[in-house]
């Protein structure tokens, strides 16, 4: 669902499980949010952006396709 976010995670070589652990989010919660079953909060989006150390805007990083 979040193609840009998915590609950035893959490019950095980070597993979703590791990212979830590092940002303090339950792995299943992260998967549900990334699949569109629930939405990311602004704080979660900012936290993920900072974790990935991305210059990409939040809007672009979390654009839905």
Predicted regions and their residues:
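Residues in the recognition helix of alpha-helical DNA-binding motifs
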Residues: 8, 22, 33
């Amino acid at each position: 669902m979040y193609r840009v976010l998915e590609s950035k995670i893959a490019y950095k070589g980070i597993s979703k499980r590791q990212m979830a652990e590092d940002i303090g989010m339950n792995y299943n919660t992260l998967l549900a949010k990334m699949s569109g079953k629930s939405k990311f909060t602004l704080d979660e989006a900012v936290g993920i952006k900072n974790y990935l150390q991305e210059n990409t805007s939040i809007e672009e990083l979390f654009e839905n396709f």
